[in-house]
């Protein structure tokens, strides 16, 4: 039996049909909720990996019908999903406390995971600090069919090395980057975009692409001490792109005041 422990709130929503339940957090660029439900209800399991790999967006979801149950996280694991098996029962939850608080859960520490955490600050792969509880890694899903649980990788970051001419790689990177920002712009709509603009290449790229794609409603800001070079360059970049720029002065006294305030 599969037990799904999720507190429905502004983040997690339940989309229920006559044949299935879909618990979803996040959003999709590539499919509507109705399309996702229809496909997952009718798909042959041998094509499931390929379909999940076609999903685009930031999401985590659990789908359950009479044939199977799957729990999926996106390619960056923007939301976590944990799972645990006890005899013939399975428990899935985004909140590991829901699993740890089960009366029959034995809190046996995974010594390897403990060492990983002590050395790096986090566990590696699908490990948690507990022997019996696992957590999906980026690009993974777990499938339960006929009381059998199996974890799959639908996406891997490290693929075969591609040997292409430099100009081809540059063209491909340009296309991928522009396509991504077009999706972001479509999602944002008419809302204002606020960019923390520094002197670095990352934020400069973001601002430049929005300008290249004709986005007008953009506000850039920088912060720090009045004479810091990052803010000076940030202001020049914003002016060149035609975007409004705001400076937020920060000093030791303002930081100390904030850290001592009730807001912090």
Model regions: which residues?
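Short low-complexity, flexible loop/linker segments enriched in glycine and/or proline
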Residues: 234, 260-264
